[in-house]
Amino acid sequence: MRTELFDFDLPAENIALRPVSPRDAARMLVVRPGAPLEDRIVRDLPALLAPGDQLVVNDTRVIAAQLTGRRIGRGLEPKIEATLIKRLDGARWQALVKPAKKLLPGDVVRFGHDGRVCLLGHLDATVEAKGDAGEVTLVFSFHGPVLDQAIAEVGATPLPPYIASKRAPDAQDIADYQTMFASNEGAVAAPTAGLHFTAELETALAACGVGLHRITLHVGAGTFLPVKAEDTSEHRMHAEWGTISSGTAEALNAARAAGGRIVAVGTTSLRLLESAARDDGRIAPFADETSIFITPGYRFRAVDVLMTNFHLPRSTLFMLVSAFCGLDTMQAAYAHAIRTGYRFYSYGDASLLFRNDITP
């Protein structure tokens, strides 16, 4: 399909720079096949689901993946900014760096800011290799959990580019950019649909007979990238690591067999569930990378309902929701959202989408 079909104009005032408080007070646009759009709030979610439905949340935790440092040991010491995007092993990370032209294989970058170092000493990394578009492979001086601790001490919250271009990250983002489910470190971006949940909402859902299950997909920086190819068939999807336990898979399969719906909280949960689904719709245990790319024409096997935020033009995520509900339906829904002041992107409002081949 032509990528331009998924483009739209978004006024800057519709981009949220901070979340609402409390989290479940965010607006939520309900999109059902063949029904009028409904303007609700996230707190209404229990009334929109049914006993036996099963929510699936992503429990990945965002790391302090934004690092600032200087190249050392080769004359001038230019400032280097790095965003960690994918862990390769205990000491090696793939990263996006600026300015990449200042680095060569073999160079050493010392990370920290304002003279700050981690408790274990300087956090140094050697450039092992350079790729295209600012990508480098960094080999750090620490390994495993020790490296994780060092990154947490000198790094900063990696805000999405559409927020970072407007303001710097601050202490509030440390809390705001984690979901209440965040427990497994490894993401460089938040699974943002989960940001809307509160303990009170979780309790209300349980009281209505709605189950809740955790899976893990470590969200990568590629989630923010627009599709530059003119045709979707030419786009190369980024890979992300995910896990679904055997117990969770069995519970979801049993609930669905009993008539319950699978409600994915976020596109990351949906992509992982669909990656683990068999042709008959049953979900298998999963522990692997997935680079699933969902566009209109895809046959959904595992997910019946999707709760998700509002996404970027020409993004793989807008393509995904268009596959889920139909392109015409989502174009109309987004036009309504823009016209009525819904807040877009990571800190923005939510939508609740019912699959276009299922009657809710």
UniProtKB/Swiss-Prot annotation:
Main location: cytoplasm
EC number annotated for this UniProt entry: 2.4.99.17
SUPFAM superfamilies, A to Z: QueA-like
Top-level taxon of the source organism: Bacteria
Reactions catalysed according to its record: 7-aminomethyl-7-carbaguanosine(34) in tRNA + S-adenosyl-L-methionine = epoxyqueuosine(34) in tRNA + adenine + L-methionine + 2 H(+)
Gene Ontology biological-process annotations: queuosine biosynthetic process; tRNA wobble guanine modification
Enzyme category, top tier: transferase
GO molecular function, one term: S-adenosylmethionine:tRNA ribosyltransferase-isomerase activity
One GO cellular component term: cytoplasm
Cellular compartment(s): Cytoplasm
Gene3D superfamilies membership: QueA-like
Protein name: S-adenosylmethionine:tRNA ribosyltransferase-isomerase
Natural source organism: Rhodopseudomonas palustris (strain ATCC BAA-98 / CGA009)
Gene: queA
